[in-house]
């Protein structure tokens, strides 16, 4: 959950830590040290919302960051839905990264075809299946949005796709 935190922490014992520049530098150093083909970079969701960057720039900077950092795949989090499905679809269309979420059916919505249940990545000659799962968002996402989503329990779906990917 990066929640649009572009800048490092400003105060307290974590002052100066975090932020996109620091994250990117660390990720690049790991890719250099271990070889980029040996590093799998995933985002578990909630890259949206949380600071004025999201509010003022409409979520575009977060998409640019995910693309620039060359994530291998991202999952959706509940805050990705804060501005509605159509707006989320607009942002997802601008991602150069596979978006995965297996336990919601987006058929018939603006996200139809943009979000896959899983992706198979290849790193260091090995195929790796990445399944995206999202918690039940009914208590934290606007009811009008939730009514457009078909939710399935993550454990059931994870087991189903694990069998498919074996």
Model region roles, listed by residue range:
Residues 2-166:
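Acidic, metal/ion-coordinating pockets
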């Amino acid at each position: 959950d990066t929640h649009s935190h572009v800048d490092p922490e400003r105060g307290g014992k974590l002052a100066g830590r975090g932020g996109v520049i620091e994250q990117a530098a660390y990720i690049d150093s790991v890719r250099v040290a271990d070889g980029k083909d040996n590093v799998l970079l995933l985002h578990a969701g909630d890259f949206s919302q949380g600071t004025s960057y999201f509010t003022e720039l409409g979520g575009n900077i977060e998409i640019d960051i995910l693309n620039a950092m060359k994530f291998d795949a991202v999952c959706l989090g509940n805050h990705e839905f804060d501005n509605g499905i159509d707006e989320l679809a607009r942002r997802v269309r601008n991602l150069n990264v596979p978006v995965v979420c297996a336990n919601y059916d987006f058929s018939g919505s603006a996200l139809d075809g943009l979000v896959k249940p899983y992706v198979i990545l290849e790193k260091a000659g090995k195929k790796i299946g990445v399944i995206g799962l999202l918690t039940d968002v009914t208590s934290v996402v606007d009811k009008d949005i939730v009514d457009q989503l078909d939710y399935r329990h993550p454990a059931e779906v994870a087991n189903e796709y694990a069998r498919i990917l074996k």
